[in-house]
Amino acid sequence: MKIRNEIKALYDMLVRIRRDLHQMPETGFDTFNTMAYVVNSIPIAADAYDGFSGVFYLPGKNTACIAFRCELDGLPVKEENLFSYASENKAMHACGHDAHMAIMICTLHYFIQHPFEYSLLFIFQPAEESGGGAKHMI
């Protein structure tokens, strides 16, 4: 599989963001620090932001829109790993939400630099694990 050099260039950022987010999991709707990290990682303003969730929109040449969604929340379990980037609080990203966020942030970076023909919507949703987050985003 051939991977574009522009995508490869985002690899170090992807790893750094994933590890940063892995260290700071939050649960349910209490994702204020996580969402602040997301907002500070993206060089454009959020189109909707309430402190614990957010939406970024990139207009395209076409009226059709493709939406991407990722989860912000972790689980209320203590991490027992000894990684240098292990969780620093009593929660854990055990389901990959830290990776989903990192991938989505880097995808957004890519499309800011390489506009797409369709409009793109990036949805950062809280409370996927505990429920209610999707309804909040709608």
State what each model feature region is.
Residues A99-I138:
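Acidic/histidine-rich catalytic neighborhood of metal-dependent amide-processing enzymes
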Residues K2-H93, A102-I105, H109-Y118:
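Acidic/His- and Gly-rich active-site-bordering loop/insert found
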Residues C95-H97:
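Membrane-interface loop-to-helix entry segments
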